[in-house]
Regions:
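An N-terminal assembly and electron-transfer interface module characteristic of large anaerobic redox
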Residues: 1-240
Length: 240
């Protein structure tokens, strides 16, 4: 709450400098890094999926709260990744779909600008003891293209697959893939690649959960609890 108020005050000023912005970022990471923690091992659970269902608590039945109440650590890839993904798509369109070089140049410039904005945050996270900086969008694309074509650009497209692989590499192999009922892009690049992900990463523990006004909340809860039971078993095995 303290840093929320500080950030609101900073961003509502007439002028915001990058120096002050990065200073606040470093201070936020430092303070969170110094919070005393209990010596408790929890399974890390990544959350991916359709952009609205993923980030809006009311749309995913407050999934983060549920996971934390069940004793797990929720891991959420950032929203900036989706913006970078939208810009990165221009390179595939230029190389294979006849899009203009000008469009690719503009979008690559946008990527550089967005990366410049979050450079301070990534550096602070990299230097921290507890946090992992996000990968570049090019790194995420390279992870995804082994399983799906980068031409999958409808909705979250290849980003969804790339985020799941990135989560597995970062120790969050337990993943909930949130999707609206009958969302075709998600079924292809989310649910559709789970089998291949399990083949490539045997330790992966992934479930796809449909969120829809007509969907049974009990079924959602049962699937998530079953995944968490497997996650806890895997955690116990790794500690022995």
């Amino acid at each position: 709450e303290k840093w929320k108020n500080i950030c609101i005050r900073q961003l509502t000023k007439d002028k915001v400098t990058m120096r002050e912005f990065n200073k606040n970022i470093r201070s936020i990471v430092k303070e969170f890094d110094e919070i005393e923690l209990l010596d408790i091992k929890k399974p890390r659970v990544g959350i991916v999926g359709e952009i609205l269902v993923k980030f809006m608590p009311a749309a995913n039945n407050y999934l983060v709260d549920l996971l934390e109440a069940e004793g797990a650590e929720a891991v959420m890839p950032d929203l900036m990744g989706f913006l970078l993904y939208c810009a990165e798509n221009a390179n595939f369109k230029k190389d294979y779909l006849g899009a203009s070089k000008k469009s690719a140049f503009i979008n690559n410039s946008v990527i550089k600008l967005l990366e410049w904005f979050r450079k301070g945050a990534k550096q602070a996270l990299k230097e921290s003891k507890r946090f992992t900086p996000p990968a570049t969008i090019q790194e995420t694309a390279n992870l995804a293209k082994d399983l799906v074509s980068l031409g999958n650009q409808t909705g979250e497209g290849w980003l969804l697959t790339g985020e799941m692989i990135e989560l597995i590499h970062n120790g969050a192999g337990n993943i909930v893939c949130c999707q609206p009922f009958a969302c075709l892009p998600n079924h292809i690049v989310g649910k559709g690649v789970i089998k291949e992900l399990r083949a490539a990463f045997p330790e992966a523990n992934i479930i796809a959960v449909d969120y829809d006004p007509g969907a049974s909340e009990v079924n959602q809860l049962n699937r998530i609890k079953l995944m968490l039971a497997t996650a806890n078993k895997n955690l116990e095995k790794s500690e022995n």
